[in-house]
């Protein structure tokens, strides 16, 4: 029978609930328990697909094509378990479902209310995750902060959930802040006490407190919070700031978080096997060399907009025994200045995805710089499209070449709208999304990196390489090394006369894992370090549901 864990947050936002939930998932999985993690987001958007990266950060795409919160990326990377659209729920999607039911007459003329109808829909979504994959444990993270108006229906739903499954099959974890007050020279528990008081006023008594702090809790503080918050001293868990998020599972293991959870849920206490994770963290913390990679993007003022990209580079660098240094470069700066000012000295360049014309010419300039100076280059989604635009303008001599997305009147639309997108009106959830197969050309760099003839990768785009220019592209020395199985859609392009120049239409960053660095990122880092690419051992990618 599935057990349920609910993770709430108090005192401040961005307190790290997602990392705590993901870390707990890793600790339970290391004990042989299967885990699925669900995120409840209180915003009214149906999904984050149309939200600005500056508002929301990265949009993480699941294998089944859901556009979700970046926390699902943490869940997948920490647990090495693919999530689905069932693992992402927003207030908007809940209200949309309830209103659709009302329009169909499912409520038999009754008055539709937050309680019981909205809360019942929320509970049903949680049950659905358990029914879909039958995990041993479902961990649910509730977005927002206790006390927010937006979160109240979710909190009420998880309070009611106790009646659905019984007290022995459910645990509440509250992540809170214990700040250090410099003027007083001590840490304060009062914010935690008030946060728990707010939670208890809703009818939820936390079983475990996870206390975020920048230093070890002072003597007697666990006992004090235990007494005031009505939890056992052993259930007051310290979560001290770490140099890397990947240290957090090991820190929480030392604090006994998993043991407390298993006790509450009356599950068997098993010995964890964290050997692989410990080895990975040791690699991360003890590199013998250094590599610097530039990420040239249009949303670099918020690094979370490219979270999976930076983490994928980190996975690959650690596996190559290298300390990763990231140089964040605003693509717009390259439109008005000399690219060398921003890119000189880097070992590799990544141009990630994005939408809209702003900064695209800067991305093209970065790619031309990488091509001219033989710097290892990896393009992702829009990064591939920008590489094609660079080829068209600067190699093939097609004046005015562009993407039809940015210039509908361009004389050379080397990037064009997918045929199936021609009549699409709505923006949300209508792109080419999720896992798609890709056929790899024998003897190509892509084939050397993947070690496979057919791969599956996640997509999020409306525009593709215009096949009217494919022959000219090939004649000018470039290679189309990956296509859809019917050869209609160009998925990977390369420049064979370059040490490492490869770009893909998909998003490989969504399937990179600490223990399985993605082959494209692994290849980039190897090339950036000057290593022989023949030594790249094709890493098996996580199993996906095709």
UniProtKB/Swiss-Prot annotation:
UniProtKB keywords: ATP-binding, Glutamine amidotransferase, Ligase, Magnesium, Metal-binding, Nucleotide-binding, Pyrimidine biosynthesis
> Example GO molecular function term?
CTP synthase activity
Q: What does the entry list as the binding residues for Mg(2+)?
A: 71, 141
Name of the protein in its database record? CTP synthase
For this chain, the family text in UniProt reads: Belongs to the CTP synthase family.
How it assembles, according to the record, is: Homotetramer.
An example of a Pfam family matching this protein is: GATase
Q: What is its pathway?
A: Pyrimidine metabolism; CTP biosynthesis via de novo pathway; CTP from UDP: step 2/2
Q: Active-site positions, per UniProt? A: 381, 507, 509
Which positions carry the signal peptide feature in this UniProt record? none
Question: Positions of the region Amidoligase domain?
Answer: 1-267
| Known function | Catalyzes the ATP-dependent amination of UTP to CTP with either L-glutamine or ammonia as the source of nitrogen. Regulates intracellular CTP levels through interactions with the four ribonucleotide triphosphates.
């Amino acid at each position: 029978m599935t057990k349920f864990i609910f993770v709430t947050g108090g005192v401040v936002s961005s307190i790290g609930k997602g990392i705590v939930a993901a870390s707990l998932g890793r600790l339970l999985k290391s004990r042989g328990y299967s885990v699925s993690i669900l995120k409840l987001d209180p915003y009214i958007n149906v999904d984050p697909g149309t939200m600005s990266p500056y508002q929301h950060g990265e949009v993480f795409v699941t294998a089944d094509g859901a556009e979700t919160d970046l926390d699902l990326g943490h869940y997948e990377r920490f647990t090495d378990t693919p999530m689905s659209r069932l693992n992402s729920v927003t207030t908007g999607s809940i209200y949309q479902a309830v209103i659709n039911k009302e329009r169909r007459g499912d409520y038999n003329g009754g008055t539709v209310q937050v309680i019981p109808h909205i809360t019942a829909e929320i509970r049903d979504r949680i049950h659905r995750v358990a029914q879909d994959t039958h995990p041993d444990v479902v961990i649910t993270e509730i977005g927002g902060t206790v006390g927010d108006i937006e979160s109240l229906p979710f909190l009420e739903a998880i309070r009611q959930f106790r009646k659905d499954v019984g007290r022995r099959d459910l645990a509440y974890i509250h992540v809170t802040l214990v700040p250090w007050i410099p003027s007083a020279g001590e840490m304060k528990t009062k914010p935690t006490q008030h946060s728990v008081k707010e939670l208890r006023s809703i009818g939820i008594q936390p079983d475990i407190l996870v206390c975020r702090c920048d230093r070890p809790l002072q003597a007697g503080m666990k006992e004090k919070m235990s007494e005031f918050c009505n939890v056992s001293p052993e259930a007051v868990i310290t979560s001290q700031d770490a140099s890397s998020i990947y240290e957090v599972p090991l820190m929480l293991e030392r604090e006994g978080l998993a043991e407390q959870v298993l006790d509450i849920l009356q599950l068997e206490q098993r010995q964890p096997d964290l050997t692989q994770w410990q080895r990975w963290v040791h690699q991360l913390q003890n590199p013998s060399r250094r590599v610097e990679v530039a990420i040239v993007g249009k949303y670099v003022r918020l690094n979370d907009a490219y979270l999976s990209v930076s983490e994928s580079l980190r996975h690959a660098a650690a596996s190559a025994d290298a300390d990763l240094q990231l140089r964040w470069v605003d693509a717009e700066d390259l439109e008005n200045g000399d690219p060398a000012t921003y890119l000189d000295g880097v070992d590799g360049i990544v141009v990630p995805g994005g939408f809209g014309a702003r900064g695209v010419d800067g991305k093209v300039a970065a790619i031309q710089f990488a091509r001219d100076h033989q710097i290892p280059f990896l393009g992702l989604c829009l990064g591939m499209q920008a590489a094609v635009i660079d080829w068209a303008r600067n190699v093939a001599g097609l004046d005015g070449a562009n993407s039809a997305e940015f210039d509908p009147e361009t004389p050379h639309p080397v990037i064009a709208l997918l045929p199936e997108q021609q009549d699409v009106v709505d923006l949300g959830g209508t792109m080419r999304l999720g896992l798609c197969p890709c056929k790899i050309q024998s003897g190509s760099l892509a084939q050397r990196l993947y070690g496979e003839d057919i791969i599956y990768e996640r997509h999020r785009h409306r525009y593709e390489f215009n096949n009217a220019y494919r022959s000219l592209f090939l004649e000018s020395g470039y290679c189309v090394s990956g296509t859809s199985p019917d050869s209609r859609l160009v998925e990977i392009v390369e420049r064979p006369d370059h040490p490492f120049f490869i770009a893909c239409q998909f998003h490989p960053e969504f399937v990179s894992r600490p223990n399985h660095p993605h082959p494209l990122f692994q290849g980039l880092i190897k090339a950036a370090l000057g290593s022989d690419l023949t030594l790249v051992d094709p890493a098996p990618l996580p199993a996906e549901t095709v």
